[in-house]
Amino acid sequence: MPMSRRLRWYLDARGVDYEVLPHLRTQTSLQTAREAHIAPERLAKSVLLEDEQGYLMAILPASRRIELGRLERELGRNLELATEPELVERFRDCEVGAVPALGEAFGIRTLIDDTLLVAEDIYFEAGDHEDLVHVNGDSFRELMADAMHGSFSLPQA
């Protein structure tokens, strides 16, 4: 599956300079960082969460894991991971596990971990398990201008 059409449209409509980088097929974000020869701190991964208020996309570095309890306390919400059928339905032009870390491109409220806001370059899934999108840090911060942000992750064990 090539780059998500919706993602491409979103980036193009905003005039963002980006490049699509192919890599060998991977199943985890840490594998992707290794295959693409990039620091896991610069690979943004998405985690789709939900509760009675709706969906929320949490974006954090591949080198970190979400601290769900902390996030729930900060937001005053009772969040859980979205199910695979929900991912398939919500991201029709993406493979499961390769959802781009740009929730707003898909009409989903987004929360970004503060650790990503200082990076010079950011990479994220293009919608498949074989391509990454690369943008510079300033462009990424502009894309995230309307996103909430906070500290809700811990280093991978």
Named regions from a protein language model:
Residues 1-157:
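Extended, low-hydrophobicity, polar/charged segments
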